[in-house]
């Protein structure tokens, strides 16, 4: 098997595109009316961030592709998960939590931990079809601090999905119906309290459809607007709600 030169490694190329940032405390602002309960469910799934880190650790202890940079990329992503957990906990500290949602999220966490799929494949599916709907939901229905955090995490997750999907593909690991069933149950729980709405960002069917498309095809054309979603202007945010860029 031909080994790629390190300079051409897709793994190293993907981590080179990351933008360093640091988690900082945020202030409590106003949430979009009608989306609050779902946002707290989405926030409760922050408890999956560190388990994703553990999935990557389990993957590092198994056979990996020989492509240069794969180990460095997985370790880099582990550090990101720690920062994501810290940033999301700052949101929880500012807004409080829904204790019922927090408890139910533990059952979801248990199901993902116990699923027998390859750990890096599980990380890929979680990030691609769950985190990639949670994050835009938070950007369109959260306050300044939530939008800032979700935008920064989203940039990391783009690299994560690319890296973890490539690892799974090189290992010949594919998601079956069992993993899809768990993905669907997780998405149903997140968006269960939404109904049908003319505002697609508060429409249950819209979000469930995006999760399904991301699982099946790896893309969701209807989420293209998130690339242009309202980003936080510096004049609209107190300093405590802005990320700290630079060496993390």
Residue map of PLM features:
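Non-heme di-metal
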Residues: 1-248
